[in-house]
A protein has these predicted regions:
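Membrane-cytosol interface at the C-terminal ends of specific transmembrane alpha-helices
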Residues: 153-191, 198-204, 211-216
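Hydrophobic alpha-helical elements at and bordering transmembrane segments
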Residues: 53, 84-92, 96, 113, ...
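Generic hydrophobic transmembrane alpha-helix motif, especially the helices
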Residues: 124-158, 165, 169, 213-214
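Hydrophobic alpha-helical transmembrane segments of multipass integral membrane proteins
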Residues: 85, 89, 93-105, 109, ...
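C-terminal transmembrane helix and the adjacent membrane-cytosol boundary/short C-terminal tail
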Residues: 2-24, 28-36, 47, 58, ...
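Membrane-helix interface segments
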Residues: 84, 115-124, 152-156, 196, ...
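Transmembrane-helix boundary motif in ABC transporter permease subunits
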Residues: 22-26, 96-128, 141, 145, ...
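Interhelical loop and adjacent transmembrane-helix boundary motif
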Residues: 8-12, 26-31, 61-64, 73-83, ...
Length: 288
């Protein structure tokens, strides 16, 4: 026998109200800690650059003076006279060329290692990461003879060797990205009739864009900051910013010139790193 209870007035449930002060108070120490950590890291990075910034505009700085004795732009003029602008353009072009070669190769290798059964994976990983264990001098000295016998242009040889040295960084970065990549988006796009090219350009590349940007940045750093391979394989005919810095630092009385060239070498990667950090921020509706 069923018992029917009389229906009473329905009172809608309302969540408890609060001013949120307890929640904000619990988050305050975390924000303060992050702020302190950010300031500490910024100070740790920027404080060593303070003397460099002073030397940029110091014509003479004698010991034990705490500040430069004479301010001026002699260092800038000397750096320009030594070919800082062409060297900057060559370094930029070299970094971009290495990035353009090593990034797609690293992405292809990472996708194969992540999604396909590769025979002898340990041996393949050893070959991919061998440039990190091989001394740069030995590699450049040995490969330089081979490139000369094959009549490979010095610039092309520099790009090839530096791309091989950048390949472990791009492969590892993209392998981590492919490991976290959801292939269901690609399958859904194919179900909806997308071609292989459309899946690549409209689904896979946008989802992996932050990882591709990180890989390209690491490969750019390899080409931008290289000294030994560019010197040995390039034969001294391809002068870049690191070569100019080393040449100026080997002399005496060139502190202001070294400061200008060092700033030229440091600022572009720093600007790219800041841009990479801004680019890597995902919008609220990002599915990746």
């Amino acid at each position: 026998m069923a018992v029917t209870l009389p229906a009473g007035p329905r009172t809608p449930w309302t969540p408890p109200r609060g001013d949120g002060s307890a929640l904000r108070a619990s988050r305050a120490p975390g924000r303060a800690g992050r702020t302190v950590l950010t300031l500490a890291l910024a100070s740790w990075f920027l404080l060593p650059l303070a003397p460099l910034g002073l030397w940029l505009f110091a014509d003479r700085w004698s010991y034990p003076a705490a500040m430069p004795d004479v301010w001026g732009f002699d260092g800038v003029r000397s750096a320009l006279a030594q070919g800082a602008v062409p060297a900057f353009a060559r370094s930029l072009g070299l970094g971009l060329a290495v990035s353009a070669v090593a990034t797609p190769l690293g992405a292809l290798a990472a996708r194969a290692l992540a999604y396909h059964r590769v025979p002898f994976p340990a041996a393949v990983n050893a070959v991919l990461f061998a440039p990190l264990a091989l001394p740069a001098f030995a590699a450049a000295f040995g490969l330089n003879v081979l490139l000369l016998r094959l009549q490979v242009a010095p610039l092309a040889g520099v790009i090839l060797i530096l791309s091989a040295y950048a390949l472990p960084y791009t492969t590892y970065t993209m392998r981590v990205a492919y490991g976290a990549h959801d292939r269901g988006f690609e399958d859904e796009a194919r179900t909806l009739g997308a071609t292989r090219w459309q899946v690549l350009t409209r689904v896979q590349v946008p989802l992996l864009a932050p990882a591709l940007a990180r890989s390209a940045f690491l490969a750019f750093l390899v080409g931008w900051s290289d000294y030994l391979i560019t010197l040995l394989v390039g034969g001294g005919a391809f002068t870049t910013v690191p070569l100019l810095v080393a040449s100026a630092a080997s002399g005496t009385g060139n502190d202001s010139v070294v400061a200008v060239l060092s700033a030229t070498a440091v600022l572009p990667p720093l600007i790219m790193l800041l841009g990479l950090g801004f680019f890597a921020r995902k919008p609220p509706g990002d599915l990746s």
